[in-house]
Amino acid sequence: MAALQEKKSCSQRMEEFQRYCWNPDTGQMLGRTLSRWVWISLYYVAFYVVMSGIFALCIYVLMRTIDPYTPDYQDQLKSPGVTLRPDVYGEKGLDISYNVSDSTTWAGLAHTLHRFLAGYSPAAQEGSINCTSEKYFFQESFLAPNHTKFSCKFTADMLQNCSGRPDPTFGFAEGKPCFIIKMNRIVKFLPGNSTAPRVDCAFLDQPRDGPPLQVEYFPANGTYSLHYFPYYGKKAQPHYSNPLVAAKLLNVPRNRDVVIVCKILAEHVSFDNPHDPYEGKVEFKLKIQK
């Protein structure tokens, strides 16, 4: 018992550790001979090669089952969201206020529209084609260059008086501002059976002492042509541009906060979702001072 309980000195422990690292009598290093180290290394190399191969095969099979032309993440909403340009947000949503006689208050709004419509210049639309059918543009095959599908052109000049060319101020200087309404994209979404979706803007609460909101729409009737639908995704249609509708508000009361709602009227577009205020419509507060 005394021998078992005898404590080893530091030099003895160092000597044992050195013999464990390299034992000249047996030719072992760290408890194994060189040949055993070679065999165990080959075993682990083969093991991890096989495991990596199985993992790569699983990833390959998984990727083969995924359609590259279908987005990985899609919203559960059946109707597209609607956005507004210019978009100035306040504490409770879109809030736009400016003074007709002070250009510094609306110059930024006009600049926002110019910058947004730069993507709708003829040069930016060179990869798209002219469409005039006014019917759904179904494409089963990839006939466009680079195994893609064709996209229909939409240029800023289609917005006519709200394109920024005849009036670079977009009507802000005269108190008849232009606002651009855009529907978000949904892959393979069809807004209706045969009728083009239409934008309708009105006061949310009609002022008692004034007429209904008068709006001039561009393109005519405020419609999104059907040949821009369906959308097949960014990979299939890399040159696709959302169609736009511009609403020129003609009789907004001065020096008063008004709330305007622009709805998309179409058979397959709903705008009464209490949980999403931008589904199928967009609301914004507007105040024009003079």
UniProtKB/Swiss-Prot annotation:
Residues exposed to the Cytoplasmic side: 1-36
Annotated Gene Ontology cellular component terms: apical plasma membrane; potassium:proton exchanging ATPase complex; sodium:potassium-exchanging ATPase complex
Pfam families documented for this protein: Na_K-ATPase (PF00287)
Spans within the Extracellular topological domain: 58-290
Transmembrane segments: 37-57
GO BP terms, alphabetized: cell adhesion; intracellular potassium ion homeostasis; intracellular sodium ion homeostasis; potassium ion import across plasma membrane; potassium ion transmembrane transport; proton transmembrane transport; sodium ion export across plasma membrane
UniProt KW keywords: Cell adhesion, Cell membrane, Disulfide bond, Glycoprotein, Hydrogen ion transport, Ion transport, Membrane, Potassium, Potassium transport, Signal-anchor, Transmembrane, Transmembrane helix, Transport
Annotated stretches, region: immunoglobulin-like: 194-290
Free-text domain note: The C-terminal lobe folds into an immunoglobulin-like domain and mediates cell adhesion properties.
Designated name of the protein: Potassium-transporting ATPase subunit beta
